[in-house]
Amino acid sequence: MIAQDIEKVLLSEEEIENRCVELAHQIEEDYKESGETPIVVGLLKGSVPFMAELIKRFEFPCEIDFMSVSSYDGTESIGDVRILKDMDLSCKNRSILVVEDIIDTGRTLVEVKKMFKNKGCLDVRCVTLLDKPSRRVCEIEADYVGF
Protein backbone atom coordinates (compact mmCIF):
# COMPACT_ATOMS: atom_id res chain seq x y z
CA MET A 1 0.00 0.00 0.00
CA ILE A 2 1.31 3.44 -0.94
CA ALA A 3 1.04 6.24 1.61
CA GLN A 4 -1.35 9.02 0.67
CA ASP A 5 1.42 11.57 0.19
CA ILE A 6 3.28 9.36 -2.32
CA GLU A 7 2.13 9.66 -5.92
CA LYS A 8 3.85 6.51 -7.21
CA VAL A 9 6.67 4.08 -6.47
CA LEU A 10 9.60 4.61 -8.83
CA LEU A 11 11.58 1.49 -7.92
CA SER A 12 10.20 -1.64 -6.33
CA GLU A 13 11.88 -3.36 -3.41
CA GLU A 14 12.66 -6.28 -5.72
CA GLU A 15 14.31 -4.00 -8.30
CA ILE A 16 16.48 -2.41 -5.61
CA GLU A 17 17.45 -5.80 -4.13
CA ASN A 18 18.33 -7.19 -7.57
CA ARG A 19 20.47 -4.17 -8.38
CA CYS A 20 22.22 -4.45 -5.00
CA VAL A 21 23.13 -8.05 -5.83
CA GLU A 22 24.57 -6.94 -9.19
CA LEU A 23 26.52 -4.06 -7.65
CA ALA A 24 27.90 -6.22 -4.83
CA HIS A 25 29.10 -8.77 -7.38
CA GLN A 26 30.77 -6.09 -9.51
CA ILE A 27 32.47 -4.51 -6.48
CA GLU A 28 33.53 -7.92 -5.19
CA GLU A 29 35.14 -8.79 -8.53
CA ASP A 30 37.10 -5.53 -8.56
CA TYR A 31 38.42 -5.90 -5.01
CA LYS A 32 39.13 -9.64 -5.29
CA GLU A 33 41.16 -8.94 -8.41
CA SER A 34 43.24 -6.31 -6.61
CA GLY A 35 43.58 -8.34 -3.41
CA GLU A 36 42.73 -5.27 -1.34
CA THR A 37 40.75 -5.20 1.90
CA PRO A 38 38.87 -1.93 1.58
CA ILE A 39 37.28 0.18 4.26
CA VAL A 40 33.63 0.58 3.30
CA VAL A 41 32.58 4.02 4.52
CA GLY A 42 28.89 4.86 4.71
CA LEU A 43 27.91 8.51 4.62
CA LEU A 44 25.38 8.88 7.42
CA LYS A 45 22.53 8.65 7.65
CA GLY A 46 21.02 8.12 4.22
CA SER A 47 23.43 5.42 3.08
CA VAL A 48 22.72 2.98 5.92
CA PRO A 49 19.88 0.90 4.35
CA PHE A 50 21.69 0.72 0.99
CA MET A 51 25.02 -0.10 2.64
CA ALA A 52 23.39 -2.90 4.65
CA GLU A 53 21.94 -4.41 1.47
CA LEU A 54 25.36 -4.28 -0.21
CA ILE A 55 27.66 -5.55 2.50
CA LYS A 56 25.52 -8.53 3.43
CA ARG A 57 26.22 -9.76 -0.10
CA PHE A 58 29.99 -9.13 -0.09
CA GLU A 59 32.08 -12.28 -0.10
CA PHE A 60 35.41 -10.56 0.39
CA PRO A 61 37.09 -9.10 3.47
CA CYS A 62 36.35 -5.48 4.28
CA GLU A 63 36.17 -3.18 7.25
CA ILE A 64 33.22 -0.90 7.93
CA ASP A 65 33.14 2.68 9.14
CA PHE A 66 30.92 5.74 8.91
CA MET A 67 31.18 9.47 8.39
CA SER A 68 28.59 12.17 8.76
CA VAL A 69 28.91 15.05 6.32
CA SER A 70 26.51 17.74 5.30
CA SER A 71 26.14 20.16 2.43
CA TYR A 72 22.45 20.75 3.03
CA ASP A 73 20.31 23.08 5.07
CA GLY A 74 16.97 21.29 5.13
CA THR A 75 16.45 20.12 1.53
CA GLU A 76 18.61 22.77 -0.18
CA SER A 77 22.30 22.29 -0.95
CA ILE A 78 24.25 25.19 0.54
CA GLY A 79 27.48 24.39 -1.26
CA ASP A 80 29.58 24.23 1.91
CA VAL A 81 30.54 20.67 2.89
CA ARG A 82 30.99 20.12 6.63
CA ILE A 83 32.29 17.00 8.35
CA LEU A 84 30.04 16.37 11.33
CA LYS A 85 31.62 13.02 12.31
CA ASP A 86 34.86 11.68 10.90
CA MET A 87 35.54 7.98 10.51
CA ASP A 88 37.15 6.08 13.39
CA LEU A 89 39.56 3.85 11.43
CA SER A 90 42.86 5.07 10.03
CA CYS A 91 42.64 5.17 6.25
CA LYS A 92 46.28 5.95 5.41
CA ASN A 93 47.60 3.55 2.74
CA ARG A 94 44.16 1.92 2.50
CA SER A 95 41.52 1.63 -0.18
CA ILE A 96 38.19 3.29 0.52
CA LEU A 97 34.75 2.51 -0.88
CA VAL A 98 32.40 5.40 -0.12
CA VAL A 99 28.72 4.43 0.03
CA GLU A 100 26.22 7.17 -0.86
CA ASP A 101 22.46 6.94 -1.08
CA ILE A 102 22.22 9.63 -3.78
CA ILE A 103 24.62 11.85 -5.68
CA ASP A 104 22.97 15.16 -6.44
CA THR A 105 25.20 18.22 -6.93
CA GLY A 106 28.35 16.14 -6.38
CA ARG A 107 29.81 18.61 -3.88
CA THR A 108 29.78 16.19 -0.96
CA LEU A 109 31.51 13.43 -2.90
CA VAL A 110 34.15 15.79 -4.32
CA GLU A 111 35.04 17.03 -0.83
CA VAL A 112 34.98 13.56 0.76
CA LYS A 113 37.25 12.14 -1.95
CA LYS A 114 39.61 15.11 -1.57
CA MET A 115 39.71 14.56 2.19
CA PHE A 116 40.56 10.87 1.78
CA LYS A 117 43.34 11.65 -0.71
CA ASN A 118 44.76 14.23 1.74
CA LYS A 119 44.78 11.53 4.44
CA GLY A 120 46.96 9.31 2.25
CA CYS A 121 44.41 6.80 0.99
CA LEU A 122 45.63 4.63 -1.87
CA ASP A 123 42.36 4.46 -3.73
CA VAL A 124 38.93 6.04 -3.27
CA ARG A 125 35.91 4.64 -5.07
CA CYS A 126 32.23 5.39 -4.66
CA VAL A 127 29.02 3.41 -4.98
CA THR A 128 25.66 5.16 -5.02
CA LEU A 129 22.15 3.82 -5.13
CA LEU A 130 20.78 6.82 -7.03
CA ASP A 131 22.50 9.24 -9.38
CA LYS A 132 21.07 12.59 -10.48
CA PRO A 133 23.52 13.89 -13.10
CA SER A 134 21.08 16.61 -14.18
CA ARG A 135 21.68 18.35 -10.81
CA ARG A 136 25.48 18.04 -10.92
CA VAL A 137 27.53 21.19 -10.35
CA CYS A 138 30.87 19.35 -9.95
CA GLU A 139 32.79 17.11 -12.33
CA ILE A 140 32.44 13.76 -10.59
CA GLU A 141 30.94 10.35 -11.21
CA ALA A 142 30.46 7.32 -9.01
CA ASP A 143 32.40 4.17 -9.84
CA TYR A 144 29.29 2.06 -9.28
CA VAL A 145 25.74 3.32 -9.84
CA GLY A 146 22.51 1.59 -8.91
CA PHE A 147 20.01 3.71 -10.81
Residue positions per predicted region:
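PRPP-associated nucleotide enzymes
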Residues: M1-F147
